[in-house]
């Protein structure tokens, strides 16, 4: 499935396993192997805390574009200290791309049909449209309220 980050399309660089296969994959992991896990959007981030430092990627499933739990999970994983690549996988819309990046995701994975319908330029344009934030974000820009307070 196509992958997209803030710069455009990119190639897959990870071996990704299902959550139920994670223990076996970690036990068999080669030193140079980049290992990731695909998790549902309703998992509690603490369930990944014991192994997150051994993972290079966590891919969070987005089963429907109207289900925003994955955004919250991504933010909580970053707050918990996960420093690897964070991927939103599944039903993401271009309009949600900027929000995913603000919540700590590094990349999104969409299906081939969506990639054909919505070219990379549409995704990058949608990302650029979100220039202001009312809430603190994981990617650092000051919020509208922080800038207003600093200007006083």
Predicted regions and their residues:
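Non-catalytic interface/targeting segments
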Residues: 1-40
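Acidic (Asp/Glu)-rich catalytic clusters
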Residues: 28-30, 46-55
């Amino acid at each position: 499935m196509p992958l997209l980050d803030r710069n455009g399309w990119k190639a897959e660089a990870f071996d990704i396993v299902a959550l139920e296969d994670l223990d076996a994959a970690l036990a068999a992991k080669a030193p140079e192997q980049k290992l990731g896990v695909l998790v549902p959007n309703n998992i509690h981030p603490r369930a990944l805390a014991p192994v997150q430092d051994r993972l290079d990627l966590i891919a969070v499933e987005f089963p429907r574009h109207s289900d925003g739990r994955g955004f919250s999970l991504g933010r909580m994983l970053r707050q918990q200290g996960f420093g690897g690549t964070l991927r939103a996988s599944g039903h993401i819309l271009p309009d949600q791309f900027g929000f995913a990046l603000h919540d700590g995701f590094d990349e999104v994975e969409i299906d081939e049909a969506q990639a054909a319908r919505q070219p990379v330029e549409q995704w990058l344009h949608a990302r650029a449209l979100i220039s202001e934030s009312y809430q603190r974000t994981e990617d650092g820009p000051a919020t509208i309220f922080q800038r207003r307070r600093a200007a006083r």
